[in-house]
Amino acid sequence: TLGMGFIFVKDLENLKNEVEKLSLDTQKLDLTILDFTGKSFFSFAIENNIKLTELHNSVMNILKQFSSYGDADFAMFNESEKVKDDVGLVKWVSNFNTEHAFDLYDPHITLGKGEKPNFDFPINFTASKIGLFHIGQRGTCKEKLAEFNLKYFFSR
């Protein structure tokens, strides 16, 4: 999760354009999954680094232009979604910019619930894309709205 916010449909294309511009100036990120976090509903804990923090801050600065923080409500969720009834999730997203972003950023990938599979941590990977998603249960990525390739840099 690089950022969260409630976006009105009328602002979605402008948001996509801004995130695409950002992606054209952002190189792929080498990241490390440290472990799982959570108990019944879990995430991968991602090791923070300067480039990830910079990307998060840039994404949040874009989201602040288009997001409705603090005054969001259940009506902003898709009617078919159970998430619209999740008071905790609405509060989480409504307050993301003040309670979970910038200096409070905790990089993670929300996975879901159930039994945790066995992995040998740490796991290194390269993030080559960023995306915009419609939120699903417990803050998971439900529906991809857009995806953007990050810029390649080659060392010499």
What are these regions (language model features)?
Residues 1-156:
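Histidine-dependent nucleotide/RNA phosphoesterase domain, centered on the 2H-phosphoesterase fold
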